[in-house]
């Protein structure tokens, strides 16, 4: 079964008009993987790969916005990424500043709203200021919600939600019998977003790396072979077409 899944993820659909604009996922999440390997293949510093990856974010954001997708969540920096070399971490942490400096006017024009999930208290002040400025400038926009997961980890998110639930139970005189899925959802960082129907990971790696582990329970996974800087609008649309070829069962039986 797993071999069939991998084979299907490599499927290519060549014609753009095969994309059904009335059957798009509402929420797409992407693990943007392969920046370092892209740079290494070209004998360039790893930070060059991250720079080119930033350009891909612009491309995919434009595509998602133009197609009318409502939510795009991008795994920008995980809670585990702090173990990387200091100069690389510093460069990645400064990328949102550069990204928003160059791209914010277009995001505003495209009616895109910037939001974040993650533990931002550990993020540098200059990065936080750039993000908060972008949030303020786009807070009334009603198009695509572009959600950056920064210093985010799925396990840490669940631990935080459990602590928050415990506090709520204590305040309200409740006990563990009152805990259900809706209560957990309410205390997650993503509580105001629908679960992603589609989760894409680039670079050919086939794992979710602690990303949206609660929310992706019924997501369709596509493991794309392209390194993130090489992922473009056509690859994004091809992933959407593969998604449309799937039948989502949510644990039930096929309708066929």
Swiss-Prot record:
Annotated TM spans: none
Cofactors: Mg(2+)
Cystine crosslinks: none
Description of how the protein assembles with itself and partners: Homodimer.
Protein's organism: Staphylococcus haemolyticus (strain JCSC1435)
HAMAP family documented for this protein: ISPT
Family according to the record: Belongs to the UPP synthase family.
Active-site residue numbers: 33, 81 (proton acceptor)
Residues binding substrate, per UniProt: 34-38, 46, 50, 78-80, 82, 84, 201, 207-209
GO molecular function per UniProt: ditrans,polycis-undecaprenyl-diphosphate synthase [(2E,6E)-farnesyl-diphosphate specific] activity; magnesium ion binding; manganese ion binding
Cofactor binding mode and count: Binds 2 magnesium ions per subunit.
Record protein name field: Isoprenyl transferase
Binding positions (Mg(2+)): 33, 220
One Pfam family here: Prenyltransf
EC top class, as a word: transferase
Keyword line: Magnesium, Metal-binding, Transferase
Protein role: Catalyzes the condensation of isopentenyl diphosphate (IPP) with allylic pyrophosphates generating different type of terpenoids.
InterPro entries on file: UPP_synth-like, UPP_synth-like_CS, UPP_synth-like_sf
GO BP, sorted A to Z: polyprenol biosynthetic process
Cellular component GO terms held in the UniProt record: cytosol
Annotated EC: 2.5.1.-
């Amino acid at each position: 079964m797993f071999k069939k899944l991998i084979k299907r993820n490599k499927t290519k659909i060549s014609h753009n008009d095969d994309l059904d604009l009335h059957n798009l996922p509402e929420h797409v999440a992407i693990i943007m993987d392969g920046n370092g390997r892209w740079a290494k293949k070209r004998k360039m510093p790893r930070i060059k790969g991250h720079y080119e990856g930033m350009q891909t974010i612009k491309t995919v954001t434009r595509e998602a916005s133009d197609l009318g997708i409502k939510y795009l969540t991008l795994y920008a920096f995980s809670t585990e990424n702090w173990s990387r070399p200091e100069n690389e971490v510093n460069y990645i942490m400064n990328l949102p500043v550069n990204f928003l400096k160059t791209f914010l006017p277009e995001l505003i024009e495209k009616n895109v709203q910037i939001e974040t999930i993650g533990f931002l208290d550990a993020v540098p002040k200059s990065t936080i200021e750039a993000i908060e400025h972008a949030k303020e400038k786009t807070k009334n926009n009603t198009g695509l919600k572009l959600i950056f997961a920064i210093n985010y980890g799925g396990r840490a998110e669940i631990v935080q939600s459990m602590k928050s639930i415990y506090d709520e139970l204590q305040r309200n005189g409740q006990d563990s019998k009152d805990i259900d899925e809706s209560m957990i959802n309410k205390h997650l960082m993503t509580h105001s977003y629908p679960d992603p129907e589609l989760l894409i990971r680039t670079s050919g790696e086939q794992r979710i790396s602690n990303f949206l582990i609660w929310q992706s329970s019924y997501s369709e996974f596509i493991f794309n072979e392209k390194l993130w800087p090489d992922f473009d609008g056509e690859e994004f649309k091809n992933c959407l077409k593969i998604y449309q070829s799937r039948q989502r069962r949510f644990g039930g039986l096929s309708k066929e």
